[in-house]
Amino acid sequence: MKGVVFTEFLEMVEQRFSPDMVDDVIDDARLPHGGVYTAVGTYPHGEIVAMVVALSQRAGLPVPDLIRAFGEHLFGRFVQAYPAFFTGVKDAFGFLSGIEDIIHAEVRKLYPDAELPRFIVEYHDADRLVLLYQSPRHFEDLAEGLMHGCVAHYKEPIRITRDTT
């Protein structure tokens, strides 16, 4: 998993909780990399899972809720860090339906070793978008949080539902 995910997670923990909480989470998680990440590095998915579990235990909040909140935070950071991805995109459906062919294609150019999830458009019309999420990491809560962040960014009254079948 790319280091930007790790650095942004730690940034969110610092903003929403405290710098001390970041230190506690890193200590509790007993991470092989010691909590030191670079945005362009690649790290095991298990390390971020360990940090989320440690945060959940410290904060008393459910892991899925924390991961979804992180997804929302991460989308906002992507808007700031990668404005070109949003240029000319008029709405949430336009952005979400272009993740695989536009966003991930560009990410692969920058980071050929990136292990990205897949977002397959199963159905799309003016009122409904059905996306299929595929990833061996099963970070569905993160994907859902990113979608909520997208909807909030475009300020649209879109309801997100999840089918786990």
Q: PLM features: what roles do these ranges have?
A:
Residues 1-34:
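Charged, compositionally biased N-terminal leader segments and the immediate start
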Residues 21-58:
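Long amphipathic alpha-helical segments
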Residues 47-140:
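Amphipathic interaction/junction segments at domain boundaries or subunit interfaces
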Residues 110-115, 152-158:
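Short secondary-structure junctions
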Residues 141-156:
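Short, non-transmembrane amphipathic alpha-helical segments
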Residues 160-165:
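Beta-rich nucleic-acid/ligand-interaction surfaces
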